[in-house]
Amino acid sequence: MHLPPAAAVGLLLLLLPPPARVASRKPTMCQRCRALVDKFNQGMANTARKNFGGGNTAWEEKSLSKYEFSEIRLLEIMEGLCDSNDFECNQLLEQHEEQLEAWWQTLKKECPNLFEWFCVHTLKACCLPGTYGPDCQECQGGSQRPCSGNGHCDGDGSRQGDGSCQCHVGYKGPLCIDCMDGYFSLLRNETHSFCTACDESCKTCSGPTNKGCVECEVGWTRVEDACVDVDECAAETPPCSNVQYCENVNGSYTCEECDSTCVGCTGKGPANCKECISGYSKQKGECADIDECSLETKVCKKENENCYNTPGSFVCVCPEGFEEDRRCLCTDSRRRSGRGKSHTATLP
């Protein structure tokens, strides 16, 4: 049995395995703990003024202010920590609910930073900023300004990573205090380093202008005390093909296509053609279409034939009511009737 093409394609699609899903990266224990603490802190903020009358009476201070440290408030905060469908959040909360209650009841005043107490010291899931790894070692450059403030410490704030510096653009070195090629040191002392970009003409530099170049970038050359652009388009051998023209840009050049009417060119448009393609001629300084139908010598040779100009050429067409016959004549089809006679005009 032969299936029709559409049915065969449909059957093939049914048999193909479904596309593999790209596995999303699961949050780390530190990220989960931090998210839980953020929700807890938000819950504290949301309930901070609840059940307070806003006055200053002794009764409010004695009775209503008890809510601030109450288990009722804690319960309201806890109920808003995890969405019902967030399994990992609910699992983490269930495992450590008693510890959060203990912090609320007895440790809150002594250790007001819940993240530091819960995620760093209790669960040992995270590290303080500026430290990394299983033992929360200091990042390169110290915990106060890791990587000299010019990079990111690998594993910063987590129990992972190796503490190495991933430098920001413009910086290099193990502590991110040295400047990359294309940058120079605007400020540097024992604690700070600030690198800024060189002029575009410099590969390396000691200052912000083209006169501060130590080495010129490719496409630039030193003239006296500064790096200046090389005009590649002025080279003895042009860098572009015969059907292109060259445009110089800072540090480089581009090759652009000549106008479609040109045979070789020196710039953009039909006014910059070296020569014109067939069917075009120089008119008022640029290549323009030749109207062959207006020439003194007829280009359409057949009798009754009409000439129509086209860009770069022309067409010869028999008018309506005429047909082109085998003798290269335009025969009036309206007069080809009766007694086998054909009324045609013949060329001399």
From Swiss-Prot:
Coiled coil start-end = none
- Cross-referenced InterPro entries: EGF-like_Ca-bd_dom (IPR001881), EGF-like_dom (IPR000742), EGF-type_Asp/Asn_hydroxyl_site (IPR000152), EGF_Ca-bd_CS (IPR018097), Furin_repeat (IPR006212), Growth_fac_rcpt_cys_sf (IPR009030), LE_dom (IPR002049), NOTCH1_EGF-like (IPR049883)
Signal peptide, first to last residue? 1-22
- FU repeat windows: 192-239, 252-299
Query: How is the quaternary structure described?
Result: Interacts with CHRNA4. Component of a complex containing at least CRELD2, MANF, MATN3 and PDIA4.
Organism encoding this protein:
Cricetulus griseus (Chinese hamster)
Q: What PANTHER family does the entry give?
A: EGF-LIKE DOMAIN-CONTAINING PROTEIN, FIBRILLIN-RELATED
Kindly state which keywords UniProt assigns to this record, in alphabetical order.
Answer: Calcium, Disulfide bond, EGF-like domain, Endoplasmic reticulum, Glycoprotein, Isomerase, Redox-active center, Repeat, Signal
Which branch of life, at top level?
Answer: Eukaryota
**Cystine bridges:** C30-C33, C139-C153, C147-C165, C167-C176, C262-C265, C293-C307, C300-C316, C318-C328
| Originating gene | CRELD2
Per the database record, which ranges form the EGF-like domain?
135-177, 289-329
The protein's annotated catalytic reaction(s) are: Catalyzes the rearrangement of -S-S- bonds in proteins
Q: Which family does it belong to?
A: Belongs to the CRELD family.
Q: Which residues are glycosylated?
A: N250
Give the motif span (CXXC).
Answer: 30-33, 262-265
Q: What is its main location?
A: endoplasmic reticulum
**Protein name, entry field:** Protein disulfide isomerase CRELD2
Q: Does the keyword Zinc apply?
A: no
Q: PROSITE patterns annotated for this entry?
A: ASX_HYDROXYL, EGF_1, EGF_2, EGF_3, EGF_CA
According to its UniProt entry, what is the function of this protein?
Protein disulfide isomerase. Might play a role in the unfolded protein response. May regulate transport of alpha4-beta2 neuronal acetylcholine receptor.
Q: List its EC numbers.
A: 5.3.4.1
GO molecular function terms attached to this record: calcium ion binding; protein disulfide isomerase activity
Q: Where in the cell is it found?
A: Endoplasmic reticulum
Name one cellular component (GO) term: endoplasmic reticulum
